[in-house]
């Protein structure tokens, strides 16, 4: 890659061996006394178990598994631990993998163990893979996370979000992942799916299973700016969305700065911003729910819940 060509040290590891590399680096740091024990004792839990598990992760073993020289692993560990500021930039190679959680955890452990986190110029910095992916997380775009980085497994956070939404309670049970969702769609456990800003018939693993799931669904709604995505052919309802140059709202960029975005041109024909489509649907749903005696939530101001806004 262009970045690798400019690197002072390129660790050209075998695919899928990231965790071995990171653990070996932490092993080197531990053996040389380069850990920030004051930070570890004050801000982390479970370090003794981690240290015990690192005994066999020698740089020699990692070199044979990862396919890189042992000396390069030691060099990487040295630079990481002894630099005044260490910043890790990573993207889909760590995030979108069958062991993605393990990869992220191992890298973050390097920062926690050396205190290279929570200060200017340091920290694990996930770039994510799509524009405004971070913005989606901030407003609750994940099935396992509440808005404004509130955790589902924290009762205080759940109560806080419920109060903000103006409802008595919300489910603290994490939702399904994208793969799990389509498994349940195929099995009939999920009856309907609303696809927005993605193309699962093309991008999800096991495309044949995804196709069967979409065919089995009682209702498929696709919200997209184009007619060409593979998922469109399964749509019962197609909602025309605007492209990036026609949208207004906010975007959270790679440095986590939130920017106000204005459209460069008017929306084409009857297309609407994604958020406008959701709001219009919610208004219509509210009318139907009121007929059933369901009380409508009263939302608070976003900036009151999430200070960056």
Residue ranges and their predicted role:
Residues 132, 139-148:
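Surface-exposed loop and adjacent secondary-structure segments within mature catalytic domains
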Residues 1-132, 136, 152-309:
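Cofactor-pocket helix-loop regions in the catalytic cores of large enzyme subunits
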